[in-house]
Regions:
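Conserved catalytic scaffold of divalent metal-dependent phosphoesterases
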Residues: 39, 53-143
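Conserved beta-sheet core of the metallophosphoesterase superfamily
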Residues: 132-202
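Short beta->alpha connector loops
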Residues: 32-33, 99-105, 158, 175-178
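Core catalytic region of metal-dependent phosphoesterases/phosphodiesterases
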Residues: 1-88
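A structural signal for the main folded, soluble domain(s) of proteins
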Residues: 6-7, 14, 97, 103-107, ...
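Non-catalytic terminal accessory segments
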Residues: 198-200, 207-271
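Active-site neighborhood of phospho(di)ester-bond hydrolases with catalytic His/Asp-centered motifs
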Residues: 19-24, 48-56, 81-85, 117-121, ...
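Cap/insert and terminal regions of metallo-dependent hydrolase folds
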Residues: 1-8, 180, 184-186, 220-233
Length: 271
């Protein structure tokens, strides 16, 4: 983790540019104090850090509870500038607008005359960078609102990609570092926005990463009927993996009575 962070902070200092984070700075809203301290020590090296929260940065995916989170600690300490939803921020030659988790991307007001850049935390996908059964409405090709922005940067989908059509560039940032053995072939990267509006991916070097093999696991895996396993997982969906997460997603995606929503969020707060 430290190697990945140091590459990013070194790159920002070398190019004299700010760092903009498209959400999910942490993988859960209540990270241990040691992790908050580590991230703070990395980001404090930079003069300008802008960010929006992802769902994992927020208790119960609730934007109003941000102050209780590790992300909220960094905001209160002044280590990051939290971008308020829909509010333009002048960063260099561009006007950046943040759309945290739960906020829809809207058409920008172009009164400033500056090129507009969207920073959003929501799932977006393209062919080869998604999962079976992904909502077609979330495909980058269906996001017509993005044509109003010179560039758009997304968090949430851990499979990074750069999609360009005409003068519109869309970067899904992807995972910042490889965390699991099934990501061994994945290339983490960060996005660079150039003054002419073009976007390029800059790789995070992983040559020093080490994946530890478990010989005992190697013996067990061949004995598993993968066809049966995959079939069962497809039947159960993500519910079998993280039930509380699915409840929170249901709350996000459906209109519930305020008292019902509040009760469910209260019950799931320990998770």
């Amino acid at each position: 983790m430290e190697r990945s962070f140091s590459q990013v902070t070194s790159l920002c200092r070398k190019l004299d540019v700010p760092l903009v984070i498209a959400g999910d700075l942490f993988d859960k809203w209540n990270p241990p104090p040691q992790l908050i301290e580590f991230v703070a020590a990395q980001l404090i090296q930079l003069e300008r850090v802008y960010a929006i929260p992802g769902q994992h940065d927020l208790p119960n995916h609730n934007y109003e509870l941000m102050h209780k989170s590790g992300y909220g600690v960094l905001r209160t300490a002044g280590i990051i500038t939290d971008m308020h939803p829909g509010v333009p921020y002048k960063i260099g030659d561009f006007s950046f607008i943040g759309f945290p988790w739960g906020y829809e991307i809207t058409k920008p007001h172009k009164g400033s005359g500056m090129p507009m850049v969207a920073i959003a935390h929501r799932y977006i996908w393209t062919e080869g960078h998604t999962y079976v059964g992904a909502d077609p409405r979330l495909s980058v090709t269906q996001s017509s609102i993005l044509k109003h922005y010179t560039a758009s940067f997304f968090g949430d989908n851990h499979k990074g990609f750069l999609w360009i059509r005409g003068k519109c560039s869309v970067l899904n940032c992807g995972g910042f570092m490889r965390r699991k053995s099934d990501e061994k072939s994945y290339q983490p990267s960060v996005g660079l926005l150039y003054t002419d509006g073009t976007v390029k991916r800059h790789p995070i070097l992983t040559t020093e990463d080490v994946f530890h093999r478990n010989p005992e696991l190697d013996k067990i895996v061949p004995e598993i009927d993968m066809d049966e396993f995959i079939s069962e997982m497809n039947r159960l969906g993500d519910v079998a993996i993280n039930f509380p997460e699915q409840i929170l997603r249901y709350i996000d995606e459906h209109s519930l009575e305020p008292n019902v929503k509040e009760a469910l969020q209260h019950l799931l707060l320990p998770f």
